[in-house]
Amino acid sequence: MDITEKLRLITRNAEEVVTEEELRQLIETKEKPRAYVGYEPSGEIHLGHMMTVQKLMDLQEAGFEIIVLLADIHAYLNEKGTFEEIAEVADYNKKVFIALGLDESRAKFVLGSEYQLSRDYVLDVLKMARITTLNRARRSMDEVSRRKEDPMVSQMIYPLMQALDIAHLGVDLAVGGIDQRKIHMLARENLPRLGYSSPVCLHTPILVGLDGQKMSSSKGNYISVRDPPEEVERKIRKAYCPAGVVEENPILDIAKYHILPRFGKIVVERDAKFGGDVEYASFEELAEDFKSGQLHPLDLKIAVAKYLNMLLEDARKRLGVSV
C-alpha cells in the first residue's frame, strides 16, 4: 500500500486530522507508527463506540500498531462505578472490540491503572497542572463529563491525564471522537512544554442517535452489539429518517460509517414495480438518490437493518450471545 492509499484509508470518514501534513510525514518516516484510542469501560458497546473501532481497523490495515487504553482510572474519576465494577466491564469491552474485528495480534490492550499510578506519571500530572489554567481544564472536560454542573476536582484532573496518556503510551497518533478535540489540543500545546512530542490527532464524527438527537445511554437511542436481530430491526424501523433529509439522518449515517466501509456496497432490495433492486458503491450515490426521493426511507431502513445484522452476527457469535 503506497502513501496515498494509506492516507485515503486513514482519513476515510474522519471529521478532522490535526494535521494532515504531519500525518503524511509520520507515515513517510516511521515504519510502524503507533496509534491509540482510550475508552472508559462501558457496559454497552454500541454503534458510537464502533466508529473508533472501525478507524482502528483502518489504521491496522495501513500498518499502524494499535494501543487500546481501557481507562479504568478515568472511568472512576468520571463517576462510572467502583474499581471492581469497572475492571469487570473493561474485560468485557476487550472481548467485544476483538469480536468486532480488531486484530488482537496487532493490538495491545492496556489498563490505565497499569501505569497511571507510577511515580513518573503522577509527577507529570502535577507538572501539567502547573501549566494548565482551571478554565482550560474545565473547557476540555465539558464535552465528556458526566457531571456538567458543579463538577468535582477529579474531573479537572481527567483531561490532564488523558493528554499525558499520549506521551506515556508512546503513541504518535491520538484517535477519538470530535468531542475529544479540546483535550487533544491541550495535549498538542502542553506536552512539548514537558519535553514530549506533540501528537497527530484524528477525530471521528459523533454518530447521531436513532431519534435524531445526541446519542445517550439514558435515552436508549442506540443499537448495542448485544441487541438481537429482531431488536435491531425494530429500532431501525422506528428510527428518525425523514424522506429527502440527508443531514443528521441516523440511518444514512449507519450506512456511511458502518456498512459501506465493511461491505464496500449496499444493495437495496425492492419489488420491480418500485424500480427493482439498486446497488450503491458510494455514500454519495446513496445520499443523492435518497435526497431526490428515488429511494424511499422504508426501503433504506430494511436494507440497513439487514446489513447491520450481518455485521454484528460474527461479533454476537464470538461473544456467545444467543439470538
From Swiss-Prot:
A motif ('HIGH' region) lies at residues 41-49. The keyword Nucleotidyltransferase does not apply. The keyword Coiled coil does not apply. Transmembrane segments: none annotated. Its EC number is 6.1.1.1. Keywords: Aminoacyl-tRNA synthetase, ATP-binding, Cytoplasm, Ligase, Nucleotide-binding, Protein biosynthesis. L-tyrosine binds at residues 36, 158, 162, 165, 180. Pfam families: tRNA-synt_1b. Belongs to the class-I aminoacyl-tRNA synthetase family. TyrS type 3 subfamily. Its main location: cytoplasm. PROSITE patterns: AA_TRNA_LIGASE_I. This is Tyrosine--tRNA ligase. GO terms for biological process: tyrosyl-tRNA aminoacylation. ATP binds at residue 217. One of its GO terms (molecular function) is tyrosine-tRNA ligase activity. A motif ('KMSKS' region) lies at residues 214-218. CDD domains: TyrRS_core. NCBIfam families: PRK08560.1, tyrS.
